[in-house]
Design a protein with these regions (language model features):
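A broad, structural surface signal
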Residues: 40, 44, 119, 123-126, ...
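Short helix-capping/linker segments at secondary-structure and domain boundaries
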Residues: 22-26, 46-51, 128-132, 220-227
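A residue-level signal for conserved active-site and pocket-lining positions in enzyme catalytic cores
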Residues: 13, 91, 121, 214, ...
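Metal-dependent nuclease catalytic cores that hydrolyze phosphodiester bonds in DNA/RNA
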Residues: 1-98, 112, 242-247, 252-256, ...
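Short alpha-helical "patches" and their helix-cap loops
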Residues: 26-34, 134-141, 225-237
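Nucleic-acid nuclease catalytic cores
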Residues: 80-185
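Cys/His-rich finger/ribbon microdomains and the adjacent scaffold used
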Residues: 166-273
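Short runs of predominantly hydrophobic/aromatic residues within well-ordered alpha helices
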Residues: 7, 88, 118, 211-216
């Protein structure tokens, strides 16, 4: 069974997906279930009657959510499956013959950047015969100031749209999902074919060393991982450091100034190198 995280990981780097399956990262201890608190507050924002809601849990059989569609007006964190993909749906509300779908976001102005997640949820629901009438986001309110107990009415904003870099509503959520070219089924078919072969070869992409370095970087590129401290490959937040390295600019002091982002930290590293 796949999760949306598996699909996103495979899309980013098939090798990363296989390496993490073999060597999963340690899970940090969870002293506070933050997601539970957010879900409870969001449920109060949506005015969900406790007697009319089905609440899903980890490990639920897929039949539980399908049965709940026939007996409840609200579904919260219900687990649905389609093909080999299992998803957790934040909130569903029965509205006539269709359902309203609500996503939660901890962003103040959620952008349209994680569309594979949204599309995967919608795809699984559609495969289960769920007709979706409306899709909205519940995101945090920038102007909210807490006084005493959290106030869900003021804490959350309901929006039909994603936001741009200037915090203005842009593309409607439903339209953004419809325009997303990622196909969950096609990705899973590629994953199934890849599972029949050995771990893919290492291919360098911008995800290998962006603002953070992939934890398998040394395994994929052992020679680069052993580079000296003054190597151009150690330049912080640089999208072009590998290209410079491949073009013979091996050391920090050899950096092409027109090929760097020009941050103060980069200049300091170049001067020190």
């Amino acid at each position: 069974m796949y999760s949306i995280s598996d699909l996103k990981k495979f899309k980013t780097c098939p090798r990363l997906y296989f390496l993490e399956k073999r060597n999963p990262p340690p899970r940090p201890p969870q002293f506070i279930r933050f997601d539970r608190t957010i879900s409870d507050l969001a449920a109060r924002k949506l005015h969900i009657p406790p007697e009319q809601v089905f609440i899903g849990h980890t490990g639920d059989a897929k039949e539980k959510a399908v049965t709940a569609l026939r007996t409840y007006r609200w579904l919260m964190k219900a687990r649905f499956e389609a093909g080999k993909l299992r998803v957790k749906v934040p909130f569903l509300h029965k509205n006539g013959a269709a359902w309203d779908l609500y996503f939660t976001s901890l962003s103040l102005y959620p952008p349209a950047t994680d569309l594979l997640y949204y599309k995967s949820v919608v795809w699984v629901l559609m495969q289960n015969g769920v007709k979706i009438r409306k899709i909205q986001l519940l995101h945090l309110n920038e102007t909210y100031v807490r006084h005493g107990e959290p106030d869900p009415e003021a804490l959350f904003v309901r929006s039909d749209s994603f936001y741009n870099a200037h915090h203005h509503p842009t593309l409607r959520v439903r339209e953004a999902i419809a325009q997303c070219t990622d196909d969950p089924l096609a990705i899973m078919e590629k994953m199934a074919r890849a599972a029949l072969s050995d771990c893919p070869e290492a291919v360098y992409t911008s995800h290998c060393r962006g603002r953070s370095t992939c934890r398998f970087y040394a395994l994929c590129f052992p020679l680069e991982a052993q580079a000296p401290h003054n190597s151009i490959l150690t330049l912080s937040d640089s999208a072009g450091r590998r290209a410079m390295w491949e073009n013979g600019r091996m050391r920090l002091k050899d950096a092409a100034l027109d090929e760097i982002e020009g941050t103060a930290q980069q200049y300091a590293e170049i001067m020190a190198g």
